[in-house]
Amino acid sequence: MSRLSVRKTYKLYVGGAFPRSESGRSYTVTSDKGEFLANASRASRKDARDAVSAARKAFPGWSGATAYNRGQVLYRVAEMLEARRAEFAAQLSDELGTSRKSAMESVDAAIDRLVWYAGWSDKISAVRGTANPVAGPYFNLSSPEPTGVVAIMAPADPLLGLISVIAPVIVTGNTCVVVCASPLIAITLAEVLATSDLPGGVVNILTGHQAELAPWLAAHMDVNGLDLTGVADPALALTCEQEAAENLKRVLRPSTPDWTADPGLSRMTRFLETKTVWHPSSA
């Protein structure tokens, strides 16, 4: 007996839930061959504002968690992604037109990248923190702390690139709002995040038009950092940088990265602040 095909609905991911855009808008997603794949929600400025509010609400709890605990959560995300390798590989292959073997290699690299960042969670403070030599009877200690809410313009690489911009931001205690270039993989990844131990609001994923959302997030006064990795238009990137200057956001605008290369520590340290404490060494 034939049955009705149940098509997947691709919504937004905000505050741990999957709402539709408040505007009711959607747009068509096609494969590299122009074939219809799905309809995705087109986020509005109101959706972006809701996502920033959710990220801000989640920040105290997430930044207050131990670094070891944050590493455990990232490892759990890797575990859940490992369990859905075949699904992600099939979706990557359909969306990008690559071979199944190449897609599977990309999924495996994304899982490995999560585990790599999870391992750094409780070590980055030892690398970035210092005991400073000072004249006088004092201890002078510097330690890294998360910046706050980071808006991320995701790169075109739908999985490895996406993981590579989200993981370093959240493993150091920040929360984020991500505007994704490839909505289908991004929202499927959101399902993994929602079923892991990651608290709602730590990662918020919006799908839609980058040119519509990026300048508004750059100007938002409750956003503390801005990652422009996925912005290919120089004029749009410049506009975002100018808007971000209003409240002195930390801005990352890298050259085109090689996502298969060793990621290094630069993305983790980019959205960290340094707190220095003076303490008497004797009574």
Per-region residue spans from a language model:
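Terminal low-complexity tails and localization/encapsulation signals of metabolic enzymes
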Residues: 1-40, 72, 76, 108-112, ...
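Glycine-rich loop-to-alpha-helix module at the N-terminal edge of alpha/beta enzyme cores
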Residues: 33-123
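Short acidic active-site motifs
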Residues: 102, 138, 212-213
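Conserved small-residue-rich beta-alpha loop and adjacent elements
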Residues: 119, 127-196
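Hydrophobic/aromatic ligand-binding patch that stacks against planar heteroaromatic rings
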Residues: 167-170, 216, 243
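Nucleotide-activated donor-binding/catalytic signature segment of Leloir-type glycosyltransferases, i.e.
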Residues: 202-203
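A charged, well-structured terminal subsegment
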Residues: 207-229
